[in-house]
Amino acid sequence: MAKLLSASQVLTIKRRTIQLEGAWGDCLGEIDSTGVVLVWGQSGNGKSSAVMSLAKELTKHGKVLYVSLEEGYALSFQNTLRRYSMQECKARFQVVTGEDMEAISARLSKRRSADFVVIDSFQYSQLNYKRYLEFKKKHSNKLIIFVSHADGKQPAGRAAVSVKYDADQKIWVEGYKAISNGRYIGNTGEYIIWEQGAKEYWGRKTKNNNEE
């Protein structure tokens, strides 16, 4: 049977947290260093750029493993690496492709493995919700970021929707903005991926809403 704690006792528990800086600090503020983050959105809205930018911010706090299941080492992925000068991160940012989730899990179980892992994408991981929970439990000492396709405004597929409700942090990407929908919200709750694109997209959306 689990031990009961008072509110005062819970508040004395020290959590290892990360204070994000700059634009990501404005979006998310201070976050737990472990748990699950789900980032989802429609194609062409800046999701890959947002995730890469967040990964670079996390390299200030530890090692990041980017599991490129969907794009592999394609030119589009290379261009995203160049856009955010990921080579500056050196050994703190590493990429792997061509491995299934069992191999990824074994890699994360090794000593001195990455502190943060990006799984791009959840759909290509072929995890169902049960296997997701097992993966999350096995690697509870990591911050796991899942990137997901979208079906409308929801993650694509029943398992991904379940992950959304379970995740500690949820980030919806639309119109070149990453919007915090989870437990951690900074000063603005938003990260602007591409300022001009966001201004044009949200300007049109506001205009269309006003005309309806």
Where are these regions (language model features)?
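Short, well-ordered alpha-helix to beta-strand connector turns
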Residues: 34, 61-62, 114, 141, ...
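Phosphate-binding/switch region of NTP-binding enzymes
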Residues: 137-212
